[in-house]
From Swiss-Prot:
One of its GO terms (biological process) is SOS response. Residues 207-242 form the UVR domain. The keyword Transmembrane helix does not apply. Residues 19-97 form the GIY-YIG domain. Keywords: Cytoplasm, DNA damage, DNA excision, DNA repair, Excision nuclease, SOS response. PROSITE patterns: GIY_YIG, UVR, UVRC. GO terms for molecular function: DNA binding; excinuclease ABC activity. One of its GO terms (cellular component) is cytoplasm. It comes from the Bacteria. This is UvrABC system protein C. The gene is uvrC.
Length: 610
């Protein structure tokens, strides 16, 4: 007979707790971290949680679940803030305010270390050589900027593998979006001028760039190079148009305007990004929180989670005052390596712009509430349709995508009671199976995913949706049984007649009778949403994987054959087909290619039956 665990003895714990600064983790009976906090004085802060009984039902519920508290002492309160941020991101405690969307933000990348640098979209680590500009609020903002830059300064944006294998200029050259460095139509010095101008633009030195171009235009005109002068004139005109559209009145540097709106226990934080005096976009965030909090608490949780692992602007303008403002300025300044100012009492144009940001936060929150009401209604109907005792807290859906069995990718999308959890989405590149065997592909993806769930690294879903019929769910059930994973309802979504949405049939493990979905049932729309999202995510991953294979040249697999030698080969022979037909003697006649390297090139193509 099991007995309930003894209540946590807070008095005994506090008797030995230090008054130093640090971080504390509250754990429940299962050892799960349910709350992380920081403190200037650990003893006083931890004691305050237990002295606040009756302050709110959620506070009481949290304290009642505490079975242990772990403490880490730090030297300063600033160190405690940094550690608290890391622990919240790692554990995502139920009772903390959590920033849901934590994926890395996109940048513009310039490969300045190359002879002919390229401009590119970049997301992820910034460890490789070159320069990064950002972060941008969205991928669309980066692509819009790249498109604008390419119209003004024709710097290449193609992949290096594509660049080194060209034998003739591509379409970008024909439409005057590139100057053709891949085939020697422009020298490094002339090309470098466009790169320098691009960097000046990205650094926000627009007026200096216009002055530079105006000087070049006058010099070209004096030399009677009227075509070149006209090109500079057009660049200046285009630049003035772009700068006039983007300039934020009265602003010169980097700043973010951050506004918060709250209704009940749902909050929206709207951020307007200004870089080098130019507004580059805005974005709304919806932190997850279990209890009602004021704007000061929401912003105080948002700022460290959002900024401590990103490039920090020089100034943050807030819609509300936050607690410990000086501490935040100090820690952010240390991270940035320069002063960071946080302001909330604003006047004039800044106050008007922040009020607009607040209006956007209110609007986004209203839309979110309406959307959540729709999702809640659909979830209620789904619960009734499946005969569940309560709405599922978490659902996963898997799908498979490939082209005639090649480059197979499986997707896993995750939904909770508020909708899609995009930060929890995962893709799996499937290897070592017979091409086109969807059962084997699904088994491999499920095995890789649910091994982590069994190990407690990932939260288990209540429902596992599979895009398929009886065969797929039986295969899925076997995989989970082999892993020892239980208590997950597996449902197959079989397409209806003519694959029409809303005409699906659901198959469940342990149930012989299928469920025929009615098109007008709101639960049907939720199932379609989940399945379509899994399909979209799978096919996007498959296309990306296939594109990498298509753009990679077989010459790149040869050791000792670098980009310049590959380019010489292609120029001399005209293409891969001609290279594959050449003998060792002809290959070794190319500058920089000795007989041993020529033999390896010959063997590569002949081993492939070329």
């Amino acid at each position: 007979m099991s007995t309930a665990p003894a209540a946590f003895d807070i008095k005994t714990f506090l008797a030995t707790l230090t008054g130093a600064p640090g971080v504390y983790k509250m754990l429940d009976r299962n050892g799960e971290v349910i709350y992380v906090g920081k403190a200037k004085n650990l003893k006083k802060r931890v004691a305050s949680h237990f002295a606040q009984r009756g302050s709110s039902p959620k506070q009481n519920a949290m304290v009642a679940r505490v079975q242990a508290i772990e403490v880490t002492v730090t030297r300063t309160e600033g160190e405690a803030l940094l550690l608290e941020n890391q622990l919240i991101k790692r554990h995502k405690p139920r009772y903390n305010i959590n920033l849901r969307d934590d994926k890395s933000y996109p940048y513009i990348y310039v490969s300045t270390h190359q002879e002919f640098p390229r401009l590119a979209f970049h997301r992820g680590s910034r460890a490789r050589p070159g320069r990064f500009f950002g972060p941008f609020p969205s991928a669309a903002a980066v692509r819009d900027s790249l498109k604008t830059l390419q119209k003004i300064f024709p710097v290449r944006q193609c992949e290096d593998s594509y660049f080194v294998n060209r034998t003739r200029p591509c379409l970008q050259y024909q439409i005057e979006r590139c100057t053709g460095p891949c085939v020697g139509l422009v020298g490094a010095e002339t090309y470098g001028e466009d790169v320098t101008n691009t960097l000046l633009f990205l650094e926000g030195r627009g007026e200096a760039l216009i002055d530079r171009l105006a000087q070049r235009m006058e010099q070209a005109a004096q030399r009677l190079e009227f075509e070149k002068a006209a090109r500079y004139r057009d660049q200046i005109s285009n630049l003035r148009t772009v700068l006039a559209k983007q300039l934020v009145a009265g602003e010169q540097g980097d700043l973010d305007m951050i506004a918060c709106a709250i209704k009940g226990n749902i909050a929206c934080v709207h951020v307007v990004f200004v870089r080098n005096g130019q507004q580059i976009g805005d974005r709304s965030f919806f932190p997850r929180m279990q209890d009602e909090h004021d704007a000061a608490a929401v912003l105080g949780a948002f700022i460290p989670q959002f900024y401590l692992d990103k490039e920090i602007p020089r100034e943050l303008l807030l819609s509300h005052e936050i607690r410990e403002l000086e501490l935040f300025e100090s820690v952010l300044g240390q991270q940035a390596g320069r002063p960071v100012k946080i302001s909330w009492r604003l006047r004039g144009e800044r106050a008007k712009r922040l009020e607009l940001a607040r209006a956007n936060a209110e609007c986004a929150l209203t839309t979110r509430l309406a959307s959540q009401q729709t999702i809640a209604d659909r979830l209620r109907h789904l619960t009734e349709m499946l005969g569940l005792a309560e709405p599922p807290k978490r659902m996963e859906c898997f799908d498979i995508s490939h082209t005639q069995g090649d480059q197979t990718v499986a997707s896993c999308v995750v939904f909770d009671r508020t909708g899609p959890l995009k930060s929890a989405y995962r893709r799996f590149n499937i290897e070592g199976i017979t091409g086109g065997d969807d059962y084997a592909a699904m088994a491999q993806a499920l095995s890789r995913r649910y091994q982590r769930i069994r190990a407690g690294e990932v939260e288990a879903p209540d429902i596992l949706f599979i895009d398929g019929g009886k065969g797929q769910i039986h295969a899925a059930a076997r995989t989970l049984a082999e892993l020892g994973v239980e208590n997950i309802r597996i449902i197959g979504i079989a397409k209806g007649p003519d694959r029409k949405p809303g005409m699906e049939t659901l198959f469940q493990t342990g149930c012989s009778d299928p469920i025929v979905v009615k098109p007008d049932n709101p639960g049907s729309l939720l199932i379609q949403h989940i399945r379509d999202e899994a399909h979209r995510f799978a096919i996007t991953g498959h296309r990306q994987r296939r594109a990498k294979t298509v753009t990679r040249s077989p010459l790149q697999a040869i050791a000792g054959l670098g980009p310049k030698r590959r380019q010489r080969l292609l120029r001399q022979f005209g293409g891969l087909r001609q290279i594959s037909r050449a003998d060792v003697e002809a290959l070794s006649s190319v500058e920089g290619i000795n007989r041993q390297l020529a033999q390896r090139i010959y063997d590569l193509f002949h081993d492939h039956g070329a």
